[in-house]
Design a protein with these regions (language model features):
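Bacterial N-terminal signal peptides
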Residues: 2-12
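N-terminal (or domain-start) structured segment
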Residues: 18-104, 142-144, 166-191, 195, ...
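Short coil/turn segments
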Residues: 33-35, 86, 121-126, 148-152, ...
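A ligand-binding cleft/hinge motif common to bilobed small-molecule-binding domains
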Residues: 87-96, 160-164, 191-225, 302
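Sec/Tat signal peptide C-region and signal peptidase I cleavage site
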Residues: 12-18
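Hinge/capping helix and adjacent helix->loop/strand transition within the periplasmic-binding protein
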Residues: 48, 73-79, 93-179, 228, ...
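An extracytoplasmic/periplasmic, membrane-proximal ligand-sensing/linker region
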Residues: 23-25, 163-164, 204, 230, ...
Length: 313
């Protein structure tokens, strides 16, 4: 009888915990309206609203340190989440920030990955990554590439390529990925590391030539296109990743619950199809896998940032 009472009490406590969250709206703080990060955050919010039975609101803030700063200072109760791209954990390597993304935030899940494709203007003779490396080595500083903001994946992806290949390719900065692609189309620059969504139509029309994709394995986003890694630079990866975080002291049971519900939302086929058309792959792994990927990316790109002396201040 005592055993029955004890088991019943434990079961009751579990049920109470399950009913405790959420009892009010949940907020996802993210960057400015527009772009892939905002899109994924909104799709997750829709899925969570349906599964949790509470409204999940997307709170857009200016891109930069503000979204992270808000969530770091929020109560660790699961009601304030942060959805951010790779720039969040790259920021401390590029500038001084008022918080530590690794120590002050707890990862929930890596939600999505938008890989970069190495594309060249057709005037460039290279048709493969090996050709491109050979061309760059033969003419140091003669080739250039266009990229978006300093520290963006299009910038760091190119610098990683230079670092691993041991070549000198000059950066031509643009205000964003769109202008960089226009510059590539117009012949202002010779190459770029761009998302499939931003260059797919131009590749199909023959206005740009794709050499390889920055994924670890061949991707359905670019059928038939080899990876940079298998084309001469083993271990190379370049993508803009995005995931969900909570304040660091958030209880493990809430992180587990949020992970389960977010991954469930991400695995819906209509959501996957929508993001696929945007050049984005759904990931949705565990919080431990996300933490490991952040650590690996920071270590990998940290060497590049230090060697190139890249700063955003």
């Amino acid at each position: 009888m005592r055993f029955f009472v004890l088991v019943s009490a434990v079961a009751f406590c579990g049920a109470v915990h399950a009913q405790e969250f959420p009892t009010r709206p949940v907020r996802i703080v993210t960057s400015a309206v527009g772009g892939t990060t905002d899109l994924v955050a909104r799709l997750i919010a829709q899925g969570l609203t349906a599964s949790l039975g509470q409204q999940v609101i997307v709170d857009n803030r200016p891109t930069g340190i503000i979204p992270g700063e808000i969530v770091v200072k929020a109560p660790p109760d699961g009601y304030t989440l942060l959805f951010s791209g790779s720039s969040l954990w790259m920021m401390p390597l590029l500038q001084k920030v008022p918080f530590d993304p690794v120590k002050d935030l707890a990862p929930v899940t890596l939600a999505s990955s938008t890989p970069n494709i190495v594309v060249v203007n057709p005037a460039v003779s290279a048709t493969t990554i090996k050709d491109l490396i050979a061309l760059a080595r033969a003419k140091p500083g003669a080739l250039n590439y266009g990229s978006g903001a300093t520290g963006a994946s299009s910038h760091l992806g190119a610098e990683l390529f230079k670092y691993m290949a041991g070549v000198n390719i000059v950066r031509i900065p643009y205000k964003g990925q769109g202008p960089a692609v226009l510059g590539l189309l117009g012949g202002e620059v010779q190459m770029s590391f761009a998302t499939s969504a931003s260059v797919a139509a131009h590749i199909k029309s023959g206005k740009l030539r794709a050499l390889a994709i920055g994924t670890a394995k061949p991707s359905a986003l670019a059928p038939g296109l080899p990876t940079v890694a298998e084309s001469g630079l083993p271990g190379y990866q370049s993508a803009s990743n995005a995931g969900m975080f909570v304040p660091v002291r958030t209880p493990a049971r809430l992180i587990t619950l949020l992970n389960r519900e977010i991954v469930q939302a991400l695995n819906k086929q209509d959501l996957k199809d929508l993001l696929f058309r945007d050049g984005t792959e759904v990931i949705g792994g565990s919080s431990q896998e996300f933490a490991a990927s952040i650590k690996a990316e920071m270590a990998n790109l940290g060497k590049v940032i230090k060697a190139a002396g890249i700063r955003t201040e």
